[in-house]
Amino acid sequence: MTEISITTSVPDAGAPPSVVGGQVERAKVSVRDLNFYYGDNHALKAINLNLIANRVTAFIGPSGCGKSTLLRVFNRMYDLYPGQRATGQVMLDSQNVLDAKLDLNLLRARVGMVFQKPTPFPMTIYENIAFGVRLYEKISKSEMDNRVERALRGGALWNEVKDQLGASGLSLSGGQQQRLCIARTIAVRPEVILFDEPCSALDPISTAKIEELIDELKEDYTIAIVTHNMQQAARVSDSTAFMYLGELIEFGETNKIFTSPTDRRTQDYITGRFG
């Protein structure tokens, strides 16, 4: 892995992927000169970074610094709210996420999201998984059964619920509900998964399961996670971005960010001097 200092520019889309340690590293998402506004409030300021395919990128920083806002730009969740707008480019492979003509339903299938609190639908465990699949595909009952099982296995939940698929998703524990939401997300076969503080409402045991799952999921998906837990960021991520007041202050390999940051503000935040 290479060490990356704060990113001031992003390679052209046509640039060849880098080769590190014999492995090809490819940007799945390239953010270029991204600015975001809540009305007149300039919430994100000239953000430039790459999310490398099949790696976990953690976003850290104090509350209100723009971490969750940035995640919501990646799949255009901000479109649900009036008065919010983004400028610049967010390239998902060769497609600009900010293109006004983009099909948002298809975008959100490609870029899934898991929220801070578990959000299971008020329906059975089986239907929680099948619901999203039906929005995009018409498949047979046997194919759906297989898809549900694969998704629940991918969410590390199958062995716990395989005999109660007809039970309500709301009957599960908090940790199980969050893994159900992860399974629901991967059921539609996304390419990128966004985690917005996925463990903040969970106990330590459930948190450990989610972190282990994230490590497994990066084999198949590109992952971005927002967290206020410094230890969690250090444990689960390959790269870390520190944000402050809407700016990307420093971005690099997680080990370097936590052991030898180049910006004093990063060091002060990591060591608890503010935040």
From Swiss-Prot:
Tell me what reaction this enzyme catalyses.
phosphate(out) + ATP + H2O = ADP + 2 phosphate(in) + H(+)
Keyword ATP-binding, does the record have it? yes
Per UniProt, subcellular location reads as:
Cell inner membrane
UniProt keyword list:
ATP-binding, Cell inner membrane, Cell membrane, Membrane, Nucleotide-binding, Phosphate transport, Translocase, Transport
Catalytic activity, EC? 7.3.2.1
Q: Name one GO molecular function term.
A: ATP hydrolysis activity
Among SUPFAM superfamilies, the record links this protein to: P-loop containing nucleoside triphosphate hydrolases (SSF52540)
Q: Which domain of life is it from?
A: Bacteria
Membrane topology value: Peripheral membrane protein
| Pfam hit, one | ABC_tran
Is Transcription regulation given among the entry's keywords? no
Q: GO CC: one term?
A: plasma membrane
Q: What is a biological process (GO) this protein takes part in?
A: phosphate ion transmembrane transport
**Where in this chain does the record put each ABC transporter domain?**
29-270
Q: Which NCBIfam families match?
A: 3a0107s01c2
What family classification does the UniProt entry report for this protein? Belongs to the ABC transporter superfamily. Phosphate importer (TC 3.A.1.7) family.
Q: How does it assemble?
A: The complex is composed of two ATP-binding proteins (PstB), two transmembrane proteins (PstC and PstA) and a solute-binding protein (PstS).
Q: What is this protein called?
A: Phosphate import ATP-binding protein PstB
